[in-house]
């Protein structure tokens, strides 16, 4: 299959297995959920009654005071007591094997092509790390909400886009399922497309 390049009259020959797949919604959902879960810190921590300091001595005797019996001032029903079902640090990551991950990326790329949300250009860059310059270039292409994917890390593009809302710059190694579906359009250089094909082959 061929992808028409926006800044050139020629078309780029690409693999059907990478850019012409049927959309597998269940697989994409599973991989995106797993990816987002893996990004969670899971560092919350509360103290149970055994972990709160103090509470070793019985506050008053068992019988004869007329008060409710109490064994510790750190009981969860007491002020400053422990938490009944205390939250503990947790690993939220889910296992996703390579085949599934690559399959999801292929599925997303194919759907982007079908929805005409993938734009391929011969080259894309700016001369200096100026946000104004990047905005002008994107305006020219009528792009506002876009992920820019280059073959190598482009320092000028990265610095220029750093302060822009709804614009992100990644190299091929930095793309993931979440970033590919988070933006309205995905702008890729021809070299990046070839590199992705090699990576997913």
Swiss-Prot record:
InterPro entries: Ribosomal_uL4, Ribosomal_uL4-like, Ribosomal_uL4_dom_sf
Keyword Ion transport: no
Ribosomal protein keyword on record: yes
Annotated region (Disordered), positions in chain: 45-66
Domain of life: Bacteria
Any one annotated GO CC term: ribonucleoprotein complex
Keyword field: Ribonucleoprotein, Ribosomal protein, RNA-binding, rRNA-binding
BP GO terms, sorted: translation
GO molecular function, one term: structural constituent of ribosome
Assembly and oligomerization: Part of the 50S ribosomal subunit.
Similarity-based family: Belongs to the universal ribosomal protein uL4 family.
Purpose of the protein: One of the primary rRNA binding proteins, this protein initially binds near the 5'-end of the 23S rRNA. It is important during the early stages of 50S assembly. It makes multiple contacts with different domains of the 23S rRNA in the assembled 50S subunit and ribosome. Forms part of the polypeptide exit tunnel.
HAMAP family (UniProt xref): Ribosomal_uL4_B
Protein name per the record: Large ribosomal subunit protein uL4
Source organism of the structure: Aeromonas hydrophila subsp. hydrophila (strain ATCC 7966 / DSM 30187 / BCRC 13018 / CCUG 14551 / JCM 1027 / KCTC 2358 / NCIMB 9240 / NCTC 8049)
């Amino acid at each position: 299959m061929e992808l028409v390049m926006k800044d050139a009259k020629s078309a780029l020959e690409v693999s059907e297995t990478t850019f012409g797949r049927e959309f597998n919604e269940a697989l994409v959902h599973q991989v995106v959920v797993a990816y987002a879960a893996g990004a969670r810190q899971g560092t919350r921590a509360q103290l149970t009654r055994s972990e709160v300091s103090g509470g070793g001595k019985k506050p008053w005797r068992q019988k004869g005071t007329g008060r409710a019996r109490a064994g510790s001032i750190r009981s969860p029903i007491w002020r400053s007591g422990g938490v009944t079902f205390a939250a503990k640090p947790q690993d939220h990551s889910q296992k996703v094997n390579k085949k599934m991950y690559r399959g999801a990326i292929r599925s997303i790329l194919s759907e982007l092509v079908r929805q005409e949300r993938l734009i391929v250009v011969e080259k894309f860059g700016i001369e200096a790390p100026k946000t104004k310059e990047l905005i002008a270039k994107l305006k020219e292409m009528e792009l506002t909400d876009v992920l820019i994917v280059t073959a190598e890390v482009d320092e000028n593009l990265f610095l220029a886009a750093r302060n822009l809302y709804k614009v992100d710059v990644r190299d091929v190694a930095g793309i993931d399922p979440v970033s590919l579906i988070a933006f309205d359009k995905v702008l890729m250089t021809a070299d990046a497309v070839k590199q992705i094909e090699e990576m997913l082959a």
